[in-house]
Amino acid sequence: MGWEEMGVALWAVWGAQGDYRRQRLPNRLTLGALSLGLAVLPLTGHCLLGAPWSAALLGIAAAFLALLPAYVWRLVAAGDVKFFMAMGALGGVDVLFPVYLAAGVITLALVARDRLFTGMVQRQYPYGVGLGLGCALVVLSHWRLALHWPLS
C-alpha cells in the first residue's frame, strides 16, 4: 500500500468523522481534495490512485450525476455531493460504485443501530459518514470495478 492510498483513506475518515460530529463537510476538505485530484491529472497523466485521466474526469461527472437527484430532493447536502465528486477525482470512476454501495450499507447499519438501541430513528443521517468510511474501506482493500479505458 502506497502513500496515495493511505492519504486518501485518512482524508476520507477525516471527512466522515467531521460529518458525524458536526454534520457538515467543509469546502476546504471537499473542494481541496477535488482540486488536488484535478491538479494531479496533467502532471502524471492519471489520478492519484492510478486510474487513467479519463476515468477521473468521468468519475467527477458520475459522482455529480449520482447524487444530484438526492440533493434536489434534500436527501443529501451539497457537501456530500462535493465529497463524492472529490472521491471520483482521486480514484476515478472505478471506485465510485463500490464506495456508493459501501456507503449505503454503512448508513443502513447506523439506522439499524439507532433503531435497535434507542428505539428512534433520526429524520436524516449524515451521508458523508457512509461515504467517507466506504471510501476508506474500498481504497484500503483495493476493491475496484475492472473497467477498461480506451482513453488513457
Where in this protein do the model-derived segments appear?
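A membrane-topology feature that recognizes alpha-helical transmembrane segments
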Residues: M1-S152
